[in-house]
UniProtKB/Swiss-Prot annotation:
Primary location class: mitochondrion
Quaternary structure (record): Subunit of the heterotrimeric GatCAB amidotransferase (AdT) complex, composed of A, B and C subunits.
Protein name: Glutamyl-tRNA(Gln) amidotransferase subunit A, mitochondrial
Any one GO molecular function term: glutaminyl-tRNA synthase (glutamine-hydrolyzing) activity
Matches recorded under InterPro entries: Amidase (IPR000120), Amidase_CS (IPR020556), Amidase_dom (IPR023631), AS_sf (IPR036928), GatA (IPR004412)
Subcellular location: Mitochondrion
Length: 506
């Protein structure tokens, strides 16, 4: 199929799938240059002069990534009139590679949510394994991205992953979701939720497509202070022996770790079945399976929901309606500036954002910071230590372990990657999530991140790949798709992608 015909198909699918609400600003409603861009890419292809493997491909962007030609709203009333004067670095990199912006996708407001229902533009709907009367959760916060990819409204999509916001939607929609190591991809032009956790991630239908996007974006950006420098990238490559990755995979079987703490009682039978099938398949391929203990996992989720809201409460203080965004028009002669500020923020932010701002402000308060924020930072360091102790490869940017005996033991018994479920259950229905009679709905949504948060706290690369399983009714394999997560040592992104491809071939 020519790139132009492919582009026309994506635009048609955006129009026919409007009810899914995957896009806030779809290309079909935005007069752009996509037709000419796709035609030009076709010409370059016939001449053998494609700019990259993504030339002429439709890439959708989560609506918290700044684009010059499309509004950037973060799915919030506070930014519903905002258009950035510049492109984010990742947008510019993809446009330079010939990719076409396919539109801006829906999300939980400012990236805060697990089901893509906290958007001022309405819920994102997922129809996988459901009929139109029972829409399923698309996961969050990058649910619009995942649904757009799953329903062929774009070739791939770029979003953000703070505690699982790429991987959870991938698991719920049967797509591939890749979160690279923290700092490899530029965050310049990405509207922040939690700076120390936010990572630009990729959603696609195949691991190979996610790799193509990653290869274009995996570059140092001097404008982003969290971007890994060229010297550090060289150190990562040298320490992890990345140039010899193929020989690493063929010289010996992989040692694959099963995190014991991820085998929880709440794990759905279909998810457990998919996990077991994946491990058995890898064992049949000659790889070694061994249990691994990550004792701080049980505290990771609590630490995350202290740290992320704390950073968010600081980041979102800038939205006052003065410099940009929506400003409250409720004005009287006697009102103070403080009243206007409070009124603007009260009207502009949704309930989940307000909840997390309050949580974050409390954990940073003088009476709570020692017992909450400081303790959460300590737990975060211990979570990373758990991973470092489990992996055979030493963290390439961390201080070297001085205990030679411990390092030798890790080299002999350490694992190459961890494999776990991405989410403990299949996607719930939208009606179940929004049922006001269910008092635990907010807490349940937080618990959905239990398997994805640890890798985020440690800044590790992780990918979610769809794998077949069975449900409670005994439906045949293939009826249920569960997300299986592969986690690697920091900087070992290529190995994570390779193992993801192994699972994809299953």
């Amino acid at each position: 199929m020519s790139l132009l015909l492919e582009a026309e198909r994506y635009v048609a699918n955006q129009s026919s799938n409007r009810m899914l609400n995957a896009f806030i600003t779809p290309l079909c409603r935005h007069s752009g240059r996509w037709h000419d861009q796709a035609k030009d890419a076709d010409i370059r292809g016939k001449q053998g002069k494609l700019r990259s493997r993504l030339d002429g491909r439709f890439i959708a962007f989560k609506d918290n990534i700044c684009t010059r030609d499309f509004p950037t709203t973060c799915a919030s009333k506070s930014l519903d009139t905002f258009t950035s004067p510049f492109n984010a670095t990742v947008v510019q990199q993809l446009e330079d590679a010939g990719a076409i912006v396919a539109g801006k996708t829906n999300l939980d407001e400012f990236g805060m949510g697990s089901h893509s229902i906290y958007s001022s533009f309405g819920h994102v709907m997922n129809t996988r394994r459901g009929d139109d009367s029972k829409f399923l959760s698309a996961g969050g916060s990058s649910g619009g991205n995942a649904v757009a990819v799953a329903t062929d409204q774009c070739y791939a999509a770029l979003g953000t992953d703070t505690g699982g916001s790429i991987r959870l939607p991938a698991a719920y929609t049967g797509t591939v979701g890749f979160k690279p190591s923290y700092g490899l991809l530029s965050r310049w032009g990405v509207i922040a939720y939690a700076n120390s956790l936010d990572t630009v991630g990729i959603l696609a239908k195949r691991v190979s497509v996610a790799r193509d996007v990653f290869d274009v974006l995996n570059k140092h950006d001097p404008r982003d202070p969290t971007s890994i420098s060229p010297s550090s990238r060289s150190r990562i490559s040298s320490k992890l022996n990345l140039p010899q990755l193929t020989s690493r995979l063929t010289s010996r079987p992989l040692r694959i770790g099963i995190p014991l703490e991820y085998n929880i009682s709440e794990l759905a039978p279909s998810v457990r079945q998919a996990w077991c099938h994946s491990l058995e398949y890898l064992r049949q391929q000659g790889h070694t399976i061994q249990p691994v203990s990550l004792p701080m996992t049980k505290l990771a989720l609590s630490a995350y929901y202290v740290l992320a809201p704390a950073e968010a409460s600081s980041n979102l203080a800038k939205y006052d309606g003065v410099r940009y965004g929506t400003r409250s028009d409720d004005s009287t002669e006697n009102q103070s500036e403080t009243y206007l500020y409070a009124k603007t923020r009260g009207a502009g932010f949704g309930p989940e954002v307000k909840r997390r701002i309050m949580l974050g402000a409390f954990s940073l308060s003088a009476q709570a910071i020692d017992n909450y924020f400081i303790q959460a930072q300590r737990i975060r360091r211990l979570v990373r230590h758990d991973f470092d102790a489990a992996f055979q490869a030493e963290h390439p940017l961390a201080a070297e372990i001085r205990n030679v005996e411990l390092r030798q033991q890790a080299k002999q018994t350490g694992i190459d990657v961890l494999i776990s479920p991405t989410a403990p259950t299949p996607p719930p229905t939208i009606s179940d999530i929004t049922d006001t009679s269910t008092k635990r709905s907010n807490l349940d949504a937080y618990i959905n991140d239990v398997f994805t948060v640890p890798a985020s706290l440690a800044g590790l690369p992780a990918i979610s790949v769809p794998v077949s399983g069975k449900d409670n009714a005994g439906n045949q394999e293939g009826d249920i798709l569960a997300g299986i997560q592969v986690i690697g040592q920091y900087g070992d992104d290529e190995l994570v992608l390779k193992v993801g491809e192994l699972l994809e071939r299953r």
